[in-house]
């Protein structure tokens, strides 16, 4: 087992990474301060792991709330089901909410914990690669709004993150690839040697090689923890973690939540960010193509939805958390391994990026 730390002073917390950690309740017990525990899961994950986790927490009074699965249910109506479960079970301020599932469950359970009786303890047990390397670390919680993704939420840090890599053995291949989009992101924004490692090991990752997966998760979480420790509330460097997300969130919102997986939209959105970075002369076309090839090898889409027009993108991108005083800030690559957040770009370059021939780029070999 590997343990990392998110350093936030008195609110610091550990990230435990290893195989079989669901069967080690001693990793969770120190972070549960009352008798009551509420496990929040979904209809896909609960049959696989809920009973096992409940057994390992036998010393506590455990209730569970099982939600419908999917991004389409990340909304007010589903959030109310969590509050209904907590109130029906008469859970008080010393309850601990545990998220058992992927990013949607983690975001909603965390937001519920932030709101319930003005804040209760919260634990993350992510079961998808995407949630293990990204959404479970850093305290971003929330729900979607019909007009924009993740526009309603709070920063609310967990007490501990428990990553059992064995849970990836039950993850569908499409979901695994979606998680690889966020892994690749770390190489692009801050760790070019990791990007090279990913190029050498992407096939092993897709084949569920436990050694490769554990290393990729550790390196991704270490990068995320360092950024969050330096900028918890995303006022500066943390925004670079959103590479591809402004374009990607536009895709998710326009196509309908859940039609494209988050990681799939991030992959296509990152290709657009690479294209814009190349058009600005910050990276070469060869470097852009390097990123595209890696996403393709990871089984991810690199062509945005062809039915989306430039106007569609601009409409959705105008409702983005990085918009400040009406200016759209974008995360782009100054070079491979170095990202910047900027609103200093010619409008014509953004327009050309939105209108680029991504189908032609996807055919490039090298």
Curated annotation (Swiss-Prot):
Gene: aroB
Sites where the protein binds NAD(+): 69-74, 103-107, 127-128, 140, 149
The keyword Cytoplasm is assigned to this record: yes
Protein name as catalogued: 3-dehydroquinate synthase
GO terms of molecular function: 3-dehydroquinate synthase activity; metal ion binding; nucleotide binding
Pathway field: Metabolic intermediate biosynthesis; chorismate biosynthesis; chorismate from D-erythrose 4-phosphate and phosphoenolpyruvate: step 2/7
Pfam families membership: DHQ_synthase, DHQS_C
Keywords recorded for this protein, A-Z: Amino-acid biosynthesis, Aromatic amino acid biosynthesis, Cobalt, Cytoplasm, Lyase, Metal-binding, NAD, Nucleotide-binding, Zinc
Cofactor: Co(2+); Zn(2+); NAD(+)
Places the protein is found: Cytoplasm
Cofactor note: Binds 1 divalent metal cation per subunit. Can use either Co(2+) or Zn(2+).
Family: Belongs to the sugar phosphate cyclases superfamily. Dehydroquinate synthase family.
Catalyses which reaction(s): 7-phospho-2-dehydro-3-deoxy-D-arabino-heptonate = 3-dehydroquinate + phosphate
Enzyme class label: lyase
Keyword field contains Amino-acid biosynthesis: yes
Listed GO biological process terms: amino acid biosynthetic process; aromatic amino acid family biosynthetic process; chorismate biosynthetic process
PANTHER family for this protein: 3-DEHYDROQUINATE SYNTHASE, 3-DEHYDROQUINATE SYNTHASE, CHLOROPLASTIC
Domain of life of the native organism: Bacteria
Binding site for Zn(2+): 182, 245, 262
Protein purpose: Catalyzes the conversion of 3-deoxy-D-arabino-heptulosonate 7-phosphate (DAHP) to dehydroquinate (DHQ).
Any one GO cellular component localisation term in the record: cytoplasm
Listed InterPro entries: Dehydroquinate_synthase (IPR050071), DHQ_synth_AroB (IPR016037), DHQ_synth_fam (IPR030963), DHQS/DOIS_N (IPR030960), DHQS_C (IPR056179)
EC number: 4.2.3.4
